[in-house]
Amino acid sequence: MNIFYVHKDPVVAAKMLIDKHVVKMIIESAQMLSTAHRLLDGEQYEDRTKAGRRIKRWRLKSKNEEAIIYKASHVKHPSTVWVMTSAYNYFWLYKHMIALNDEFMLRYNHTIPHMTIRKLKEILKYPPKNISLSTIQTDPTPAMPDECKIPGDVVGSYRKYYVMKKKEMASWKAPSQPPQWYTEGVENG
């Protein structure tokens, strides 16, 4: 679970992500947005996992939403907490998720959106009813090793994280290309 905040603009950030993250982060973004709905607007109850363990869950009042929105996941993860802090943060991630899908369709030559987008685009378009509208947008909390963090610079931290820790899996399918900051970071080692 993460938000690869490599640019403050959610669309530009999506274009800069490596191929693997373009696909994977559509699902993770939808999980965080869904979790925001469940925790902020849902009613908590106790359930059991398939293995019989007790687990906290949140039920939505709307049967339509309950049937469609993903289950709550990683409820204490810094990225999930960030999404739930304000409507502005929520909208940033929603726009990023849509841009990731556009990038997915472009890079992989798909004419049909990712399954997650087909299922959740409309229902996640609006933030939870109980999310703060008065809290301004903030940068996400960096979720990465300390050695990658640059104090006071979340974008720089995520870029450094990409250069230091994601090199082995870094690829950009044409027509996309690695961002300049990435190629310079790898060259300068």
Residue ranges, per PLM feature:
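Sequence termini and other peripheral, non-core segments
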Residues: 1-76, 80-189
